Swiss-Prot record:
Gene behind the chain: cof
Disulphide-bridged cysteine pairs: none
Designated name of the protein: HMP-PP phosphatase
Catalytic site positions: D8
Annotated GO MF terms: 4-amino-5-hydroxymethyl-2-methylpyrimidine diphosphatase activity; magnesium ion binding; phosphatase activity
Record's function text: Catalyzes the hydrolysis of 4-amino-2-methyl-5-hydroxymethylpyrimidine pyrophosphate (HMP-PP) to 4-amino-2-methyl-5-hydroxymethylpyrimidine phosphate (HMP-P).
Obligatory cofactor(s): Mg(2+)
Amino acid sequence: MYRLAAFDMDGTLLMRDHKIGSITLNALHQLADAGVTLTFATGRHYLDMKGILSHSGLNGYLITGNSTRVCDAEGNPLYGMDLPAELVEFVLRTPWQTNASIHLFRDDGWFTDRNDPDLLIAHTTSGFHFQLTEWDELPLTGNHKFCFIASHQELVELKAQLEQQMSGEADFCFSATDCLEVLPRGCNKGVALEKLSHHLDLTLADCMAFGDAMNDKEMLSRVGRGLVMGNALPQLKQELPQLQIIGRCEQQGVAHYLHHWLSSPHLTYSPEF
């Protein structure tokens, strides 16, 4: 039996309205009652996640900011990584050939120089919001990650620029088709979950994980059982063909799988609804 379950949020636990469905909530509570440690592994900020979990009546370990921070259920930090100050300065001062908006995340919040209220729709439950700033007003240290937001094709072109200029100095991943992230080198959900597992005297083989995007790849590929959402990015499905595909987030596919696993863990699972 798996002793820890790690869940991505957007496109996995959350439905298209950015909320956790009632069937999913029920399944998560059943899982916790069965003695399985809940872990939420997401690109979202710690403050955002605490609001979501409080609203939902859930508790668990948190891997946030795409693994730049790991906290226990009480919010105590267990592990963290920041971008090097010189890299932050380089990203902010380089005139990239793009119309993408840029967003910087720190312990004290989400910062941007572009006011786009539409981005707040995904954070209605928690009330988490960006803070408008001038980039030269922020410290160059203590920064978790950058996000660039634009159309996918524009971000593909930007990623090529970033990789050419910063090859080997940072990691890049698509947490959504319209969101490109710049992360500390070697920072991913697989590494973070391994550190958390060690803290809990577990191994990755003791874990199951659910995800839908490229920032979930390392986590899904390294755990004892990785489950790919039906709505996952095509690239993720292509790169992890050995993993089982379950239902879609809008169908509360995670709950469907968990109910099956809790009641009939040794039977073959079918994602049909």
